[in-house]
Design a protein with these regions (language model features):
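Outer membrane beta-barrel
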Residues: 1-75, 96, 100-104, 109, ...
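Membrane-embedded beta-strand positions in outer-membrane beta-barrel channels/transporters
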Residues: 10-12, 52-54, 95-98, 136-140, ...
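Surface-exposed extracellular loop regions of Gram-negative outer-membrane beta-barrel proteins
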Residues: 21-27, 132-173, 283-284, 289-296
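Transmembrane beta-strand segments that form the barrel wall of outer-membrane beta-barrel proteins
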Residues: 25-29, 36, 40, 64-71, ...
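Outer-membrane beta-barrel translocator domains and adjoining extracellular loop/strand segments
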Residues: 35-42, 75-86, 121-134, 162-171, ...
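Internal metal/ion-chelating core segments
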Residues: 57, 61-152
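Extracellular/periplasmic loop regions
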Residues: 127, 149-153, 157, 162-246, ...
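Outer-membrane beta-barrel "beta-signal"
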Residues: 314-321
C-alpha cells in the first residue's frame, strides 16, 4: 500500500503456445544459472522481483528467454522517472536475452547472457533526468562427470554508469569440487571482480547487479551484500578451500576458508582484506523439514577498515540457527 506496509512479492500469468513457446507477464522472480547476475534472493520480507514480460522457447536441449521490463512509479521523483538506487526500482528499463544448451552426449552445459540495463539519474530540483545504459554479457559453463563438478563464468560490462562514466569491467569465477567417496567432497574456487582505482579514463568496477550475493563471497556478507565505504570500489579477489562431510543420509556439514583481497591497487593500502571461516551443519528432520546451524568468523586488515568500516582488531563472528 502507499504507507509501505503491504507489498506484492509475486503475481504473474503464463500462457503456453504449443509445446515449446510461452509468455509470462507480471511480477516475477528472475533466476538464471548460478545466480551471479540474476538471482531469486529471498532473505528479506519482500524478496527480489521484477515487473517484466518473459517470452520463452524450450525443448529437451535448448532454452531461450527474452525478458523485457519497464518501471514507472508516480510516487518517485520527477514524475516517476528518477529512481533512487536504494529503492525497490533500481532500473527504468531492462532487456535481457538468455540461452542455455544441454547436451545429450557430453557432460557439459553452457549458457549465454546479454543484458541491456537503463539506469536513470537526474536532479529533482531542475527536474532533469538522464538514462544511462549499461551492457552486461557473458557465459556460464558446467561440467559434471566421474565425481567432478566444475563450473565457471565470465562476464564483461560496457556502456555508462549513473555518473556518465564509460565502463570497462569484468568478473570471472571458477569452482571445482571432487567427490572422493559418498562421504567426503573437497572444493576449491576463485572469484575475481574487477575494481576501480581511480587512475583510468574508464570505470573498471564490476556491478554485480541482481545476483544472489549471499551465495558467494563468504557467509558473513561483507562483500556486495552491502556497499563499500568512503567512495571506494576496489573489486574483490576471493580464494576458497572447502570440504563437505556427509555423516548420513540426513546429516551433512560444510567447512570453508576464504581469503579476500582487493582486485584494484588502492593508494597507500595493501590489497589483503582478511580471512573468513564458515561452518554449517544441516539435518533433514523429515520430509520438507530441515534444520541448519552455522558459525563464521572474520579476521580483517587495516585495508578492510578503510574500504568497509569497522575495526579489524575486534573479534568479528556470527552464529545462527
Amino acid at each position: 500500500d502507499k504507507n509501505g506496509r503491504f507489498i506484492m512479492n509475486e503475481a504473474w500469468a503464463k500462457l503456453n503456445f504449443g509445446k515449446n513457446f510461452f509468455a509470462q507477464l507480471g511480477r516475477q522472480t528472475l533466476s538464471y544459472d548460478d545466480e551471479r547476475i540474476l538471482g531469486g534472493l529471498d532473505w528479506n520480507i519482500a524478496g527480489r522481483y521484477h515487473d517484466a514480460l518473459k517470452l520463452g522457447y524450450a525443448d529437451p536441449n535448448n532454452q531461450l528467454h527474452l525478458i523485457l521490463a519497464f518501471n514507472q512509479n508516480d510516487e518517485t521523483k520527477i514524475g516517476g522517472t528518477y529512481y533512487v538506487q536504494a529503492g525497490a526500482q533500481p532500473y527504468k528499463n531492462m532487456q535481457t536475452l538468455w540461452y542455455h544448451y544441454k547436451s545429450d552426449y557430453t557432460p557439459f552445459d553452457a549458457s549465454l547472457l546479454f543484458m541491456n540495463l537503463g539506469l536513470e539519474t537526474g536532479d529533482a530540483a531542475t527536474k532533469e533526468s538522464h538514462t544511462r545504459y549499461l551492457q552486461t554479457m557473458g557465459t556460464y559453463i558446467t561440467y559434471k562427470d566421474n565425481g567432478w563438478n566444475v563450473d565457471g563464468a565470465f562476464y564483461y560490462q560496457m556502456g555508462k554508469n549513473l555518473n556518465a562514466e564509460k565502463v570497462s569491467a569484468f568478473m570471472a569465477s571458477l569452482q571445482a569440487a571432487y567427490a572422493i567417496d559418498k562421504t567426503w567432497t573437497v572444493v576449491a574456487s576463485a572469484d575475481y571482480l574487477s575494481g576501480d582505482s581511480g587512475d583510468s579514463d574508464k570505470y573498471k568496477a564490476f556491478n554485480v547487479l541482481y545476483g544472489t550475493h549471499h551465495k558467494f563471497y563468504g557467509a558473513m556478507d561483507y562483500f556486495y551484500a552491502s556497499d563499500f565505504k568512503n567512495g571506494y570500489a576496489p573489486g574483490l579477489f576471493d580464494k576458497r578451500l572447502g570440504v563437505r562431510f556427509c555423516a548420513s543420509d540426513k546429516v551433512d556439514m560444510d567447512l570453508n576458508y576464504h581469503h579476500f583481497s582487493t582486485a584494484a591497487k588502492l593508494p597507500n593500502l595493501k590489497k589483503a582484506l582478511g580471512s573468513e571461516v564458515d561452518y554449517q551443519i544441516n539435518w533433514s528432520v523429515m520430509k520438507d523439514v530441515k534444520l541448519s546451524a552455522g558459525y563464521s568468523f572474520m579476521r580483517g586488515t587495516e585495508t578492510m577498515d578503510v574500504v568497509k568500516g569497522g575495526n579489524h582488531k575486534s573479534w568479528q563472528d556470527w552464529g545462527w540457527v
